[in-house]
């Protein structure tokens, strides 16, 4: 079976594990973009520690869940967002103001929309979590 979108698969695994009340999950295969998205989610307090495990193929990521995710998913197509358009996309993907996080890929790396707004840069929306 071929995975069309590994990031969507990873967020689906996390959401399903959170829904069933598990304390950890394994994301297979691992990639840099998934690791960077998990780092942003960890910085925002949605997941605990995570570690890369080499299985001889692409590797796996073991993620500790802390039960704070209500919903998460990818944004397709990957919309380009200017620094002045952030609020429009917050209204579209997040349930309330200052609740949840949009995860962006920018020229400075993967970051939350809060950090991108502080730096005054835009990017492309990868995912949302709340």
Curated annotation (Swiss-Prot):
GO terms for MF: rRNA binding; structural constituent of ribosome
Pfam families in UniProt: Ribosomal_S8
Recorded GO CC terms: ribonucleoprotein complex; ribosome
Stored PANTHER family: 40S RIBOSOMAL PROTEIN S15A (PTHR11758)
Function in brief: One of the primary rRNA binding proteins, it binds directly to 16S rRNA central domain where it helps coordinate assembly of the platform of the 30S subunit.
Family as reported in the entry's similarity comment: Belongs to the universal ribosomal protein uS8 family.
Protein name (record): Small ribosomal subunit protein uS8
Organism: Methanocella arvoryzae (strain DSM 22066 / NBRC 105507 / MRE50)
